[in-house]
């Protein structure tokens, strides 16, 4: 299969156009202009709100003018991540895609199918002339990935439909009817630097090759967190060396909503201890590889000497390492309802650590389907860093989307799927944030579902789109549109 053979052709044509447009989160200006031009070129009513969300209206197919208006919604931004040895500028370069069997992938970068494929499906609906449907509103939101900015900023009345299909889910055959709420915690350790004592040897250790992944949807997959592993080594080694280890820097993770998959630390030890530290690192690496032998089979541990540099003041460095060792990470509780007892209810992810000249900045994200548990988890993370002397701020929370007791749209979506594929879809909740949570606050009567084609390894350069599922989602969506229209 080559790219010219991908089906539905109209969807993949639109996706190819989208991937020519730089659209990092918070920098969607080019995408907004593209959407405006698209709407105008097709003579469709096109609106842009003050936040930058775009809405394009398409009139009903003749004969279906009195049908219920249905909203199709996706987000226009993408997570920007690349392999360390790939030269790529997400602010100006086009995503380079290729076909690998049944999967569409990108060359060394994120693919942008989260949520570019959702946008492409909407544009294909707007451009098509042979789809039966009632009135449609296609909505494209800004900055979903780093703050849900578009959904936060959207005012009541911008959308007018009473049913909404969110096209930002990642497992074909699953229809999502609820999602987790979330919040982000930021901790900063301020410090001064000083010269290391005489007789110290400087070392750099790195960890890479982890799977990483989405910090909500993938948090229960037993994947390693690079930050927690590196912090664990520092804590253990400093204990062994009677507190003599001196830290220079700790850097790992780039995004608040991804499990960090690589990292690097620089530190100094006494000359007399350097060979023991090398031996300890090798033993530690073997132990961690054994712990994750099923889920992480490409871990790469490295240690080398490096140039001398000013070290972080001892008291701050030690408290920073202890805080990282102590802070909760991973899935913490599962749902209490027996029907969904397998699903993660509350989790936390230490997402990034960045060191500059006089501070270390940490980002951790918390999620829960129960808002009181979200508040408690956020306070637990906050307390760990406050006890260690950090300056802590907490970002705006976004709400959970609660399952609707009697959802006409869910019933229509299930029946349409059964009609097409002869089996029931899985109706479930997701332990990740969807914009549906915010929409449910502004539009409490809105009946919503979320589904999409199968994606794997989102938010990483291994992101992949399962090609056959795009056509399945397309057919499913068209059947729902026909059902609503009739």
Region roles according to the model:
Residues 76-78, 139-147, 169-172, 211, ...:
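Acidic, glycine-rich active-site loops and adjacent beta-strand->loop/helix elements
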Residues 64-146, 151-162, 202, 317, ...:
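Active-site metal-coordination/substrate-binding segment of hydrolases
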Residues 225-227, 232-250, 403-446:
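Active-site-adjacent substrate-binding region
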Residues 102-105, 145-146, 156-367:
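Midchain, well-structured core segments that form catalytic/ion-binding scaffolds
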Residues 343-432:
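Substrate-recognition/cap regions that form aromatic- and gly/pro-loop-enriched pockets
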Residues 2-102:
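Acidic/His- and Gly-rich active-site-bordering loop/insert found
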Residues 36, 157, 222-240, 272-274, ...:
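His/Asp/Glu-rich mid-to-C-terminal helical/loop segments that flank catalytic regions of hydrolases
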Residues 7-11, 345-361, 421-479:
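Zn-dependent metallopeptidase/amidohydrolase metal-coordination segment
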């Amino acid at each position: 299969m080559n790219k010219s053979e991908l089906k539905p052709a109209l969807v993949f044509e639109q996706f190819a156009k989208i991937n020519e447009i730089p659209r990092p989160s918070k920098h969607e200006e080019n995408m907004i202009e593209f959407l405006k031009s698209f709407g105008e070129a097709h003579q469709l009513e096109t609106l842009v709100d003050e936040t930058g969300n775009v809405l394009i209206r398409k009139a009903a197919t003749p004969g279906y003018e009195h049908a219920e208006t249905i909203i199709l919604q996706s987000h226009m931004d993408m997570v920007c991540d690349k392999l360390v040895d790939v030269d790529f500028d997400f602010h100006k370069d086009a995503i380079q895609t290729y076909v690998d069997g049944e999967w569409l992938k990108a060359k060394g970068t994120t693919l942008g199918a989260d949520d570019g494929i959702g946008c492409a499906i909407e544009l294909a609906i707007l451009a098509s002339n042979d789809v039966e449907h009632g009135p449609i509103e296609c909505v494209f939101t800004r900055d979903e990935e780093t703050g849900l900015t578009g959904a936060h900023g959207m005012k009541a009345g911008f959308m007018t439909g009473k049913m909404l299909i969110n096209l930002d889910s990642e497992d074909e055959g699953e229809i999502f009817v609820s999602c987790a709420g979330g919040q982000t915690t930021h901790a900063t350790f301020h410090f001064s630097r000083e010269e290391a004592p005489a007789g110290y040897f400087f070392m750099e250790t790195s960890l890479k090759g982890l799977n990483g992944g989405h910090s909500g949807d993938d948090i229960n997959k037993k994947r390693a967190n690079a930050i927690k592993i590196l912090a664990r080594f520092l804590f253990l080694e400093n204990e062994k060396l009677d507190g003599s280890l001196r830290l220079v820097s700790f850097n790992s993770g780039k995004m608040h909503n991804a499990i960090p998959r690589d990292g690097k630390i620089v530190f100094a030890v006494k000359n007399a201890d350097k060979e023991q530290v090398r031996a300890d690192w090798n033993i530690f690496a073997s132990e961690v590889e054994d712990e994750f032998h099923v889920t992480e089979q490409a871990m790469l541990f490295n240690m080398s000497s490096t140039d001398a540099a000013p070290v972080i003041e001892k008291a701050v460095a030690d408290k920073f390492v202890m805080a990282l060792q102590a802070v909760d990470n991973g899935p913490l509780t599962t749902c209490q309802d027996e029907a969904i007892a397998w699903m993660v209810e509350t989790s936390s992810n230490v997402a990034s650590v960045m060191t500059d000249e006089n501070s270390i900045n940490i980002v951790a994200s918390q999620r829960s389907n129960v808002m009181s548990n979200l508040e408690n988890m956020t306070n637990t993370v906050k307390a760990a860093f406050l006890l260690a002397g950090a300056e802590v701020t907490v970002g705006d929370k976004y709400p959970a989307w609660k399952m609707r007791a009697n959802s006409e749209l869910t019933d229509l979506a299930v029946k349409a799927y059964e009609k097409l594929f002869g089996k029931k879809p899985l109706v479930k909740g997701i332990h990740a944030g969807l914009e549906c949570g915010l929409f449910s606050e502004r539009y409490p009567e809105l009946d919503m579902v979320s589904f999409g084609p199968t994606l794997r390894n989102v938010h990483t350069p291994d992101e992949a789109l399962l090609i056959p599922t795009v056509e399945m989602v397309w057919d499913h969506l068209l059947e729902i549109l026909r059902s609503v229209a009739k």
